[in-house]
Amino acid sequence: MPTSSKNQPRYKRVLLKLSGEALMGEHDFGIDPKVLDRMALEIGALIGIGVQVGLVIGGGNLFRGAALNAAGLDRVTGDHMGMLATVMNGLAMRDALERSNIRTRVMSAIPMSGIVEHYDRRRAVRDLKEGDVVIFSAGTGNPFFTTDSAACLRGIEIEADAVLKATKVDGVYSADPHLDPTAVKYDHLTYDEVLDKKLGVMDLTAICLARDHGMPLRVFDMNRPGVLTRIVTGEREGTLIE
């Protein structure tokens, strides 16, 4: 549970959700090594102050199922391909973290013997307690579920204090701030307000899952240096949904 002392992090354990697109940097496709290294520094700063970090990464930088689905690709096949993309991203992130001397384990919701370990909740929690970063890949292992839903699910399973969703904007707005200059930023929202206002922060399944299990969500801009440390130590960043 969150701690109250100002000398300690507010959160003991967090689940960080990164979009695959965030790994592209300024490119249109793939993985930017500079972004990986910067993410590793941010995550390493949390480990350094005793925060346990679980990580879920999307796959949109390597595979965009929606476009191929519209062109006739079977939805289930597309989702399976997307799961494989998240595993590739997880392996890349593990490499960056381990180059920064941060012990990291990648677990997959689908068996991939010899490449990554099969997801085991109890093992994951033990690793987190030992100070390892645990990357949860392959989504939930089921088609029709997004990586946002996977992030909320894993966050609930590992009893994280919050799910932190990294985006390209500094919180949740009433409209897309890049398209609407009158868009208003929200500092705090309830789950039901997110659903009623159709703000599109996460998909319906993810929001309902978080609401039903009382999992706080924090939406923030990952491009702001030091943002993760500020969040876990209680500073105001982005939008809190609870």
Swiss-Prot record:
UMP binds at G59, D79, T140, G141, N142, P143, F144, F145, T146, T147. Pathway: Pyrimidine metabolism; CTP biosynthesis via de novo pathway; UDP from UMP (UMPK route): step 1/1. Homohexamer. It comes from Marinobacter nauticus (strain ATCC 700491 / DSM 11845 / VT8) (Marinobacter aquaeolei). This is Uridylate kinase. Inhibited by UTP. Its EC number is 2.7.4.22. InterPro entries: AceGlu_kinase-like_sf, Asp/Glu/Uridylate_kinase, Uridylate_kinase, Uridylate_kinase_bac. Pfam families: AA_kinase (PF00696). Keywords: ATP-binding, Cytoplasm, Kinase, Nucleotide-binding, Pyrimidine biosynthesis, Transferase. It is found in: Cytoplasm. Catalyzes the reversible phosphorylation of UMP to UDP. It catalyses: UMP + ATP = UDP + ADP. ATP binds at K17, L18, S19, G20, G60, R64, T167, Y173, D176. Belongs to the UMP kinase family. GO terms for cellular component: cytosol. GO terms for biological process: 'de novo' CTP biosynthetic process; UDP biosynthetic process. GO terms for molecular function: ATP binding; UMP kinase activity.
